[in-house]
Amino acid sequence: MIKVLRKRMAKLGGKKVHKKLQPHFKDQGLRCSRSKLFDIMRDAGLLVKKCKRYVKTTQSYHRFYKYANIIKDAKIERSEQVWVSDITYIKTKEKSLYLSLVTDAYSKQIMGWELSDNLKTESSIKALKMAIGNRRYPNRSLIHHSDRGFQYCNPEYVKVLDKNGIDISMTTRHDPYENAVAERVNGILKDEFGIENFITQKQAKREIKTAIGTYNYERPHLSCGYLTPWDAHRMEGYKLKTWSRKFTERDMSLSVN
């Protein structure tokens, strides 16, 4: 069963594998603790080894206006309260690519994305427009949070935010914790779904599209109480972790919206 699950999510962590297998264990009348499953996976060589990588894509030395961080002490309590945006590097044998992502800070659902062979603002705008088109709660007040990269400070990008009534927040320094959700989602896509080292740009786009779909609709999120981002996006009254320096306590009372 683990091998079948790994065909869809090759590097899914052990805790999430255990959670995903609970219905199967129940159907078979089996009981398997997390530590026991870890032992089985370790003996079979199925535990995932994480590797760290970092390629800087933020270019914050530019002439555009830089906005303040207005979510620093905010409590993220609902979907479409805060979106986080970031750009991550993707390697192919043809050329270097850059993946622009817009993620909901509450549900961790990837709302919009765009893959490009350059760092121009147009690519980030396409990801943003996709996210806006995918809004489930268009009447809710929304804050867009990002680093101080020139793409997000560009007047053309700001114009799209203003047109849609979206407030702007930016990091104050180059600190991963100030945009922790975006950094974490980048890591999940690379570490668990292996979205790098492709042969061609066409292959990269095809496999990244599949990976994002699997991430949104199938992958359980620890910080979402093992809900998928798609399901978490529809929850209310559930205080989720936001990958800050101090995680908030979770209120286990749920209501589906």
Question: What kind of feature is each model-predicted range?
Answer:
Residues 1-2, 17, 21, 37, ...:
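Mobile genetic element proteins and their domesticated derivatives, centered on retroelements
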Residues 1-79, 232-237:
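Basic, flexible linker segments flanking DNA-binding modules
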Residues 11, 30, 75-77, 92, ...:
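Conserved, non-catalytic sequence blocks in retroelement Pol enzymes and Pol-derived host proteins
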Residues 58-60, 146-148, 154-158, 168-190, ...:
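RNase H-like two-metal-ion nuclease catalytic core shared by retroviral integrases
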Residues 76-111, 117:
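An active-site-proximal beta-strand-loop segment
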Residues 95, 114-137:
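Active-site beta-loop-alpha junctions of metal-dependent nucleic acid enzymes
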Residues 109-113, 169-171, 195:
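Short small-residue beta-strand/loop micro-motif enriched in glycine and branched aliphatics
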Residues 162-166, 188-257:
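C-terminal domain-tail junction helix/linker
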